[in-house]
UniProtKB/Swiss-Prot annotation:
Descriptive protein name: Cytosolic endo-beta-N-acetylglucosaminidase
Top-rank EC class of the record's enzyme: hydrolase
Keyword Transmembrane: no
Swiss-Prot/TrEMBL catalytic activity: an N(4)-(oligosaccharide-(1->3)-[oligosaccharide-(1->6)]-beta-D-Man-(1->4)-beta-D-GlcNAc-(1->4)-alpha-D-GlcNAc)-L-asparaginyl-[protein] + H2O = an oligosaccharide-(1->3)-[oligosaccharide-(1->6)]-beta-D-Man-(1->4)-D-GlcNAc + N(4)-(N-acetyl-beta-D-glucosaminyl)-L-asparaginyl-[protein]
Record's function text: Endoglycosidase that releases N-glycans from glycoproteins by cleaving the beta-1,4-glycosidic bond in the N,N'-diacetylchitobiose core. Involved in the processing of free oligosaccharides in the cytosol.
Gene name in the database record: ENGASE
Length: 743
């Protein structure tokens, strides 16, 4: 249901707000009516900045309980929440065309620049995510309420992420694409055919002329390009006729060529299944029977039942493309495999010995098969055992901002202020994760630092990074490297760190960085040049932050709510490459004892000073559509006093400048569902995060309009800049919904 829109000035809007707060409201008008624009004395809402001539769009709606059906492919049938989806047949694939609803599933995050690039010949690590059929809690694009969701956060060890399911065309849920891209990891969907039905599907597009298979390839490329992921794993798990298998290499070559043209860095991989005779016959290696498929695309993913002799034989077959062979490792250890489960390191030891890439299949084993309450401990144990075989990659662009949020939590916090209580899970909200693990000093090993993700407290989002350690008596400090970067830096950068120490301790905390190109690199704003290397620097906190940067540094040097402290730094550089971010923990002056510490990191930011002064565009053209009304669940009989409102917001904004959008409203009410809390009177109610220029509001509790009355809802869209500061409310986008009872 579309609401009729009219435009009014703020003065008319304020007059109507006063009417709705107790005065008699005028009769509801028709859709063509416009609100009068007679100026009135202005009364400011606390905390709001009002521009005199600013206009807002008002949508009029007469409440109706008639259904407004939404397409089930794009919306959960029970809640109408937007969901990620798959395609189940060749017909669905060929018929796919972009629709407005597809916009929910388009990735906001482009693939981040990284070093080394994926095209380098360093052996890579591929993670193939296969969990209980796929499209579980991760299908809810705007998040969901989940007590113990699965989380992956060792991204700096991963080069390629494949989302796997047994549906014909598996389009990765957008949350995975956003999160992986943020970490410089490319994302592949899966094109799979299986059993007799799969055989018929393959014959339909492969046994004919080139137009048939080119149409399928073109559609796969269009889907990749539209949803902004990076390519496909091709998995043919059925026998092929001679005609069909003969057309498979040209299909792969055409798909790979077209993808490379349309998607920078695009990737097509072939799974070890069918051989060149058309038989379904897994080889567990690259050999003369399947080499033709490897030669036709970007890489080869082997089956899992290999032995070291398979790896040795593959050396000759792979030649200079050794890194393009991804040796499959089933973490569930099904079949006659090497390693698996907590012995997966045995598989990787052999694979890396021979210089191949690795494909870890279903590492969600730690979540599916072990106790959920021990998930984080088991996840860290699993990846910790693989650490020596997993080379990391570096992020190489600014701004660099992270609150360590995992995209989940037991409550939601916004810059130290609690917004909502209750479990939540939103994959797109996961921010850049650090290098995890335990770091020990040399010698007797008494000095150590460990990092863990922790849901118990947060500065922004739902989690923080817990750093525990011991400073032994013989050293003055210990440091932990959190991020590997290779970022060219502008002449001046600002850095910020939010942290808090727990328990009685006098240990001091400092942010450090390392720089490259030391011969020509000049750096200002440092307090200590580490004696071990001229490229590691300890930063000097700003005592008086520049007033022109108040919106970013307003909290610098202050003790904040919840015990958090924020330090800000200004660093001048010339000809430098930013390599690492470290946090250093130093013993108090005069101390000669062993010092233990527990520190919680809430946020780290590295931003170009010039970007903080650049104006941010405003959110434009907010619209309201697909409105659905329901009586409150507790008032199914008689005239309802409360209603449940669902609707979709759309707006315009330059996506390259934002991390996400925060959606709020005036006029909504708290309900009993977890994660939603009645706001303070001077604050709008937070509804959720959007990682697209559209957002579906679902079952918002509102007051019913009485006879002859209008009720008012105001929806606000807050852009969150990549630099990580809050935008004043006057710069948010907004739209008003005026609704009335039927005549």
């Amino acid at each position: 249901m579309e609401a009729a829109a009219v435009t009014v000035t703020r003065s008319a809007t304020r007059r109507r707000r006063r009417q709705l707060q107790g005065l008699a409201a005028p009769e509801a008008g028709t859709q063509e009516e416009q609100e009068d624009q007679e100026p009135r004395p202005r009364r400011r809402r606390p905390g709001r900045s009002i521009k005199d001539e600013e206009e807002e769009t008002v949508f009029r709606e007469v409440v109706s309980f008639s259904p407004d059906p939404l397409p089930v492919r794009y919306y959960d049938k029970d809640t109408t929440k937007p969901i990620s989806f798959y395609l189940s047949s060749l017909e669905e694939l060929l018929a796919w065309k972009p629709r407005l609803e597809d916009g929910f599933n388009v990735a906001l995050e482009p693939l981040a620049c990284r070093q080394p690039p994926l095209s380098s010949q360093r052996p890579r690590t591929l993670l193939c995510h296969d969990m209980m059929g796929g499209y579980l809690d991760d299908r809810f694009i705007q998040g969901s309420v989940v007590q113990t969701p699965y989380a992956f956060y060792h991204w700096q060890c991963i080069d390629v992420f494949v989302y796997f399911s047994h549906h014909t065309v598996t389009i990765p849920p957008v949350g995975w694409t956003n999160t992986a891209h943020r970490h410089g990891v490319c994302v592949l969907g899966t094109f799979i055919t299986e059993w007799n039905e799969g055989g018929r599907l393959c014959e339909a597009f492969l046994a004919g002329d080139e137009r048939s298979y080119q149409a399928v390839a073109d559609r796969l490329v269009q889907i990749t390009q539209f949803f902004r992921f990076d390519g496909w794993l091709i998995n043919i798990e059925n026998s092929l006729s001679l005609a069909a298998v003969g057309n498979m290499p040209p299909f792969l070559r055409y798909l790979t060529t077209q993808l490379h043209r349309q998607v920078p860095g695009g990737l097509v991989l072939w799974y070890d299944s069918v051989v060149q005779s058309g038989q379904l016959k897994w080889q567990d290696e690259l050999n003369q029977h399947n080499r033709v498929f490897f030669d036709s695309c970007d890489g080869f993913f082997t089956n899992y039942n290999w032995r070291e002799e398979h790896l040795e034989r593959m050396l000759g077959q792979a030649g200079e493309r050794r890194a393009d062979v991804y040796v499959g490792v089933d973490v569930f250890a099904r079949g006659n495999v090497v390693g698996g489960r907590f012995d997966t390191d045995k598989s990787l030891e052999l694979i890396r010995k021979h210089g191949f890439s690795v494909a870890l299949f279903a590492p969600g084993w730690v979540y599916e098969c072990l106790e959920k309450k021990d998930f984080f401990q088991n996840q860290d144990k699993f990846w910790g055992r693989l650490e020596r075989y997993l080379p990391t990659h570096s992020i190489c662009s600014l701004p660099f901002v992270t609150s360590f949020c995992l995209g989940m939590g037991a409550r939601r916090v916004c810059y130290g202020q609690e917004e909502a209580v209750g479990p939540w899970y939103h994959l797109s909200a996961q921010e850049i994760q650090p290098l995890f693990g335990e770091h020990r000093l040399g010698g007797d090993g008494r000095g150590w630092v460990r990092t863990h993700c922790c849901l118990e407290d947060a500065w922004h989002g739902g989690s923080s990074l817990l750093v525990r350690g011991v400073i032994p008596p013989e050293v003055g400090n210990v440091a932990v490297r959190l991020f590997s970067l290779q970022a060219p830096v502008p002449p001046k950068i600002y850095l910020s760190m939010v942290y808090k120490l727990e328990g009685p301790t006098d240990v001091t905390v400092a942010l450090e960085l390392t720089t490259g190109d030391a011969g020509s690199c000049h750096i200002g704003g440092i307090s200590v040049l580490n004696a071990e290397t001229s490229s590691r620097h300890s930063l000097r906190p700003l005592r008086v932050p520049p007033t022109k940067l108040a919106r970013w540094v307003g909290r610098c040097g202050r003790q904040l709510s919840g015990g958090w402290v924020q330090h800000c730094y200004e660093v001048s550089l010339r000809g430098c490459l930013l390599l690492d971010l470290l946090v250093c923990f130093s013993r108090p002056p005069g101390s000669r004892e062993e010092e233990s510490f527990t520190c919680r990191l809430g946020e780290i930011q590295v931003v170009d000073a010039a970007s903080l002064l650049a104006p941010l565009p405003q959110v434009q053209a907010v619209t309201i559509s697909h409105i659905r009304w329901q009586p409150s669940a507790s008032e199914r009989e008689g005239p309802p006093a409360l209603l449940q409102l669902s609707c979709t917001l759309h707006w315009s904004f330059l996506l390259s400048q934002v991390r996400c959008f925060r959606i709020h409203c005036w006029g909504g009410m708290s309900d009993d569902s977890p994660g939603r809390e009645l706001p303070r009177p001077e604050m709008p109610m937070f509804l959720g995060l959007a990682f697209a220029t559209q957002y579906r509001i679902v079952d918002l509790l509102v007051e019913a309009a009485g006879p002859g009355q209008d009720r008012r809802m105001e929806f606000l869209v807050e852009p969150v800049p990549k630099e990580g500061f809050r935008v004043p409310q006057a710069e948010w986008g907004r739209a008003v919904l005026l609704y009335s009872a039927p005549a």
